[in-house]
From Swiss-Prot:
Keywords: Allergen, Secreted. This is Pollen allergen Beta v 1. PROSITE patterns: OLEEI. The keyword RNA-binding does not apply. GO terms for cellular component: extracellular space. Its main location: secreted. The lineage of its organism: Eukaryota, Viridiplantae, Streptophyta, Embryophyta, Tracheophyta. Signal peptide: none annotated. Belongs to the Ole e I family. It is found in: Secreted. Transmembrane segments: none annotated.
Length: 20
């Protein structure tokens, strides 16, 4: 499962407040 990549993307999105 792409956990590392997902986490990295989620972190970026979280910074923008996209995924909250």
């Amino acid at each position: 499962v792409q956990g590392m990549v997902y986490c990295d993307t989620c972190r970026s999105a979280n910074a923008l407040g996209f995924m909250r």
